[in-house]
Swiss-Prot record:
Pfam families the record matches: Ribosomal_L10 (PF00466)
Gene name tied to this protein: rplJ
Family from the record: Belongs to the universal ribosomal protein uL10 family.
Subunit structure: Part of the ribosomal stalk of the 50S ribosomal subunit. The N-terminus interacts with L11 and the large rRNA to form the base of the stalk. The C-terminus forms an elongated spine to which L12 dimers bind in a sequential fashion forming a multimeric L10(L12)X complex.
Protein name: Large ribosomal subunit protein uL10
UniProt organism field: Shewanella sp. (strain W3-18-1)
């Protein structure tokens, strides 16, 4: 079904707004995936703070023009699903990577983060980024381990002092 010019402009504006507020983007080919599976993906995406849209390639190219995700334009061939992470940079990559494991026909084409293109083979780099809470927990564990090590060294020095005095 042909889209009217006003509809096309609205789609480009909507996707462009999502791109401007996004932290990262992932492009994928959803050909052969059932409607039920796509509905489940969209539900998970909403819960994870990811904007997902199936867009015509020409409209997708125009929507990302002038944004940090312009490097994705070369991946817009065939049926294109584009996902923008709005809350966490790795959310869309993690979501689509997990979905690709479940669906044999689903293929991730590539991702973009801070203006850099990430090929599909290296999508794990983006998907494995820790969330804010995970990063805080890692920092706290590092600080805790450092203070424990300092405490152990202090006790060892105190023991050495007492042995020398005795």
């Amino acid at each position: 079904m042909a889209l009217r010019l006003e509809d096309k402009k609205a789609i480009v504006a909507e996707v462009n707004e999502a791109a401007k507020g996004a932290l990262s983007a992932v492009a994928a080919d959803s050909r052969g995936v059932t409607v039920g599976a796509m509905t489940g993906l969209r539900k998970k995406a909403r819960e994870a703070g990811v904007y997902v849209r199936v867009v015509r390639n020409t409209l997708a190219r125009r929507a990302v023009e002038g944004t940090a995700f312009e490097c994705l334009a070369e991946t817009f061939t065939g049926p294109t699903l584009i996902a923008f992470s709005l809350e966490h940079p790795g959310a869309a990559a993690r979501l689509l990577k997990d979905f690709a494991k479940e669906q044999a026909n689903f293929e991730v084409k590539g991702a973009a983060f801070e203006g850099n293109f990430i090929p599909a083979a290296e999508i794990d780099r983006l998907a494995k980024l820790p969330t804010y809470e995970e990063a805080l927990a890692q920092l706290m564990m590092t600080m805790k381990e450092a203070s424990a090590g300092k405490f152990v060294r202090t006790l060892a020095a105190l023991r050495d002092q007492k042995q020398e005095a005795a």
